[in-house]
């Protein structure tokens, strides 16, 4: 029986892989800054990755000050990073500096050999026509799409850039000929990361998300992966969905975010 706990590090690492795809990575003291040129205003377009916890813990106040100044000089709209396995002192320092945080729960599942009985299908977004049509999925929707505001055209441009140069694939979720939403995957060794599951409001609560996660389990098997996983914001509908899908909550990380003056 596969011990899913050992894939928790792969799930955490998959976020760093995602943020680096299509990004310009600049070394800073204690971290790297991953920026996607022209799309820095998106949350995933400007973020600190590969944070060196030892450097931060030993000099956290000065690190926060100098890093904030550097990002402001570069014109970054925010300072955003993920932390886990840290002492209480650093989160306290971040809160004092005006950072907001949220907990993301990491769910892991086992590949499934049998193809699930599903009414939905996944169409990979590959051609120029596919990408040009994809922003229509988000039109008419008010509020954040993936937890953050962002123009649909820009979000799709970010997806396209990341999908064009690495192990990431993006799919449109279809029911018959109707497009209901989208989802992406990233291959990280023997692990399959599921990313950015989105359903239009009129298709939520109809069991489509559960079918998609079942398809992800079978896709992981087809790709000969040992496990697959995804993150959900604590207390969100996604957390309930992944629990219903049989995935196990086996790790977590905390996102820290602070807008910067420009």
Model-assigned labels for residue ranges:
Residues 1-74, 86-87, 152:
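N-terminal charged segments
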Residues 1-14, 46-49, 54, 105, ...:
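Short amphipathic alpha-helix that is part of the acyltransferase structural core
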Residues 25-28, 92-100, 167-181:
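Conserved beta-hairpin
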Residues 56-133, 256-258:
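Acyl-donor-binding surface of acyltransferase catalytic domains
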Residues 59-68, 199, 205-220, 244:
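Conserved acetyl-CoA-binding loop-helix of GNAT-fold acetyltransferases
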Residues 74-83, 220-233:
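Conserved GNAT acetyl-CoA-binding A-motif
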Residues 87-101, 206, 210, 234-252:
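Conserved active-site alpha-helix within GNAT-family acetyltransferase domains
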Residues 150-200:
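A conserved beta-strand-loop-helix scaffold within acyl/acetyltransferase catalytic domains
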């Amino acid at each position: 029986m596969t011990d899913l706990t050992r894939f928790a590090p792969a799930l955490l690492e998959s976020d760093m892989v995602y943020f680096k795809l299509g990004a310009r990575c600049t070394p800073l003291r204690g971290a790297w800054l991953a920026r996607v040129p022209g799309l820095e205003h998106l949350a995933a377009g400007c973020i600190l990755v590969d944070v060196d916890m030892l450097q931060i813990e030993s000099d956290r106040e000065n690190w926060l000050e100098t890093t904030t100044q550097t990002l402001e000089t570069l014109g970054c709209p925010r300072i955003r990073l993920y932390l886990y396995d840290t002492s209480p002192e650093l989160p306290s320092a971040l809160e004092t500096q005006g950072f907001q945080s949220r907990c993301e729960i990491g769910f892991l599942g086992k590949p499934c050999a049998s193809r699930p009985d599903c009414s939905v299908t996944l169409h990979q977004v590959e051609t120029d026509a596919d990408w040009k049509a994809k922003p229509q999925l988000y039109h008419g929707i008010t509020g954040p799409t993936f937890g953050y505001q962002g123009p649909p055209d820009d979000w799709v441009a970010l997806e396209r850039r990341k999908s064009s140069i690495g192990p990431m694939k993006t799919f449109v979720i279809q029911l018959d000929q109707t497009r209901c939403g989208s989802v992406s995957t990233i291959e990280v060794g023997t692990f399959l990361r599921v990313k950015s599951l989105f359903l239009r409001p009129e298709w939520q609560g109809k069991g489509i998300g559960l079918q998609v996660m079942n398809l992800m389990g079978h896709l992981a098997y087809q790709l000969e992966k040992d496990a697959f996983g995804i993150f959900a914001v604590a207390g969100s509908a996604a957390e309930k969905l992944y629990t219903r899908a049989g995935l196990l909550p086996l790790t977590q990380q905390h996102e820290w975010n602070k807008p910067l003056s420009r």
